[in-house]
Amino acid sequence: MKKKMLIVGITMSVGGSEKSFLSFAEHIDYNEWDVTLLLAEKKGALLALVPSQIKIETMPDGEIMEIDVANAKKVLLKNYALKNPLRIFPLLCHSAKIFFSSGKRRAYAKHRLWLSAMKTMKPCEGEYDLAVAYWGDRTMFYAVDKVKAKRRIAWLHFDYNFPPREDALYEKYFMQCEKIVTVSKEIEKSLGESLPS
């Protein structure tokens, strides 16, 4: 019987993580693994290049994974205020911290705001032998909090120190992953400088 692998992504837009994923997908043993790619949204110029052996599914409330400055207000109001008005209070607390902070504290508050929003997402259905958070920190948070898996691996495609990240928060999530894969020596160095263990 094949083992089940879930790869957590965001979209298949033309970007470094997506291109790297396609290369990674070429090396999966599909005789050993039943693979599902879980995306926030089933879109992107590279979507057609996903191997046919990979089943593609979308996350409920996936727009939360795609929050950015341009759409944050709309997405957060839709997922907080309209669904459950009481959820607005943590949002307001994090928003105030963002507004009144600068530098590292502001970056930390932005991560906490997003994490608070992600916590409202429905869990991923099914159980997996392996969950791979391939698109970075947001997918790692989702894989740890929302996916039932025996093992987890996180891929880092970004400089850990930019924007500043809250070490205590990230360490908590890294500890729940069996392995952290860095895609370059520079990324490995930036992670090691902040979290040497």
Predicted regions located by residue number:
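Short amphipathic alpha-helix
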Residues: 17-28, 42-49
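Short N-terminal targeting/anchoring amphipathic segment
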Residues: 107, 119-136, 153
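A short, active-site helix/loop in glycosyltransferases that binds the activated sugar's phosphate group
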Residues: 140-142, 178-197
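Nucleotide-sugar donor phosphate/pyrophosphate-binding loop at the beta->alpha transition
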Residues: 110-119, 140, 157-176
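Active-site proximal beta-strand in glycosyltransferases
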Residues: 130-135, 141-160
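Short His-centered aromatic/hydrophobic patch
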Residues: 93, 97, 133-138
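Nucleotide-activated donor-dependent transferases that construct or modify glycoconjugates
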Residues: 2-14, 23, 39-42
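N-terminal strand-loop element at the rim of the active site
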Residues: 33-104
